[in-house]
Every structure is written in structure tokens, then in C-alpha cells.
Amino acid sequence: MEIMAVKQILSNCKILYGNDSVTIGLRREEIIRDYFHGEIPEVTVLDSPGNYDLYRSYLEGQSLFAVKTAVVMENPFFIKRPPKDKKEENEFNGFINILKELTPDTLAIFTVDGALDKRTKASKTLLSVCGSEECSLLAPREGASVIARMLMDCGKRVEPEARAYMEEVIGSWETISRPFLQTECDKIVLMAGNRTGISKKLLEYACLLYTSPSPR
């Protein structure tokens, strides 16, 4: 009987990818804060393209001293292109083993601008050990639904007329980011106070979603 391998996703290895750089930056900080439970670790950001020796020196070197550290690798070179030769392929496999052996005091975060091609061997292998999260801009047609859910999570209910108003206004924008919608949601909740229902009048009174902003 064949035994199927089970993926072991590491709690201290994350991949953030997508075309919303603002959200990637915010999520990166949130992940670091949550992983270390509010403690402030030493954070190292390694710019693209990087190399295995550089990555290894920070991941392994910091672990030896048992210092709480977060190593952020931006647009790692192996994500965008396949190994040049067998030597580089072996280096990649060795790098994956380093990730698997990280101590809990070290958090590894990869950030990728744009789409992550999950068909490549490098992406598949990395995703087999690291948790991933897409951080992309929203289509205008999604905006009203997203902010309505945010408001619902805050205990608010969007009235039908207000929902139609949001769909009309947000639908005219070119691009939308989740952080911007979250900011708008926070403002609406503040203006609503103890009121559960969110009306069109309240949105207009708060000067929220009143005019189309520049693309975000």
C-alpha cells in the first residue's frame, strides 16, 4: 500500500504575493507582530534578487544566537526563473531544508510582487512548506461587498439604499485596496456610534464614498 506524503506547513514561514504592495507591507508587519506576540524582533529585509548564501547567512546565523528575528526576502530570484543547472537545483533543495530546520525564534517571510506561478517546481516546493496569502487589488465590482462584510464584522448592517449607493460610487473607481476600504469602514463605524443600521444619509453626512477618489 502506497503511503502519501503529508505537507508540513511551517508556522514560521510565510509567502505574501500580489499586486497590492500596500497590503503586502501591512500584512508583513501584522504577521511579524502576531508571530512574536507583540515582542519586537530584529527584522532584516533582503532586497531582490538575493542569493542562497545571503539568505542562509541571515537565516542560520541569527538562529545560532537564539535571537528573535524576522528575515524578509523580497522577490527571491528562484521564484521568477527555473534553476540554471543541477548545482543551482541542489542549492535550492538545500535552502528548503534550511527553512524546515529553522528554530521557532526565526520567522521567514517571502514577498513577491505580482502573481505567483504555482505551476513551477520552485513555487510548488515552497508552498509545500510555507503558508501563503494573496494580497491583490480588488475589482471595483467587489468593493461594496467587501466593505459591507467589514461593517457586518463590526456589528453594523448596511441598509439597501446605502448598499446601492456604495455599489454606484465604488463601482466607478478604477482600483481598490483592502487597506483603503478598511479605513473607510473604520470611519463609518465611528460616525455610526451606537446605531446598528448604516444609511445612505449617514454615508453622505460623513463625507464618505461621496466622490470617486483617484485610483488606489
Where are these regions (language model features)?
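Conserved small/polar residues in nucleotide/adenosyl-binding loops
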Residues: 210-216
